[in-house]
Curated annotation (Swiss-Prot):
Residues 1-7 are intravirion. Keywords: Early protein, Host cell membrane, Host membrane, Membrane, Transmembrane, Transmembrane helix, Virion. The chain crosses the membrane at residues 8-28. Induction: Expressed in the late phase of the viral replicative cycle. Its main location: virion. GO terms for cellular component: host cell plasma membrane; membrane; virion membrane. This is Inner membrane protein p22. It is a single-pass membrane protein. Residues 29-174 are virion surface. Belongs to the asfivirus inner membrane protein p22 family.
């Protein structure tokens, strides 16, 4: 009987030592990971990092979109995008309009003396408007085209040749 008690107490001590080792390793590992830097714009982050959902990240543009725009659905043919200060920029992409989606179509024809491109005019329209602008799309050439300003937060992106689509970064609908 005495032999069984010693074995149980030995197992109990071994279990306690094992739990202490696991706790020390966990705390050491957690201490080694640098805290995520809080940001509002890309300039707040280090080289090669971008501000995604309020923290600096080295995610690719497509991965950042998937993290920032949780409800966005993307066509598998969309293989890249790029960061701009206020938007995720896609080329050869269009927003698929399903039932219930809303947008405003604006014909853009800059005057000859205008210093801004048609795409810059679309971007400014989206930024100047309310927070309801969830993205914009431009199709046309440099002289004449159409700007669709989206006001519904649930977009589905499909591959379409010669379309340019921008989704706001760090937006309230993310």
């Amino acid at each position: 009987m005495l032999h069984i008690k010693m074995t149980i107490s030995t197992l109990l001590i071994a279990l306690i030592v094992l739990l202490i080792i696991i706790l020390v390793v966990f705390l050491y590992h957690k201490k080694q990971q640098p805290p995520k830097k809080v940001c509002k714009v890309d300039k707040d982050c280090g080289s090669g990092e971008h501000c995604v959902r309020g923290t600096c990240s080295s995610l690719s543009c497509l991965d950042a979109v998937k993290m920032d725009k949780r409800d966005v659905k993307m066509d598998s043919k969309i293989s890249s995008c790029k960061f701009t200060p206020n938007f995720y920029h896609f080329t050869d992409t269009a927003a698929e309009q399903e039932f219930g989606k809303t947008w405003h179509s604006i014909k853009i024809t800059p005057s000859p003396g205008e210093s801004h491109t048609s795409q810059e005019i679309c971007e400014r329209y989206c930024l100047w408007g309310t927070d309801d602008c969830t993205g914009w799309e431009y199709f046309g050439d440099e002289k004449d085209g159409t700007c669709n300003v989206y006001t519904n937060p649930y977009l589905a992106l499909k591959y379409t040749k010669d379309h340019v689509l921008y989704l706001p970064r760090n937006h309230k609908y993310a």
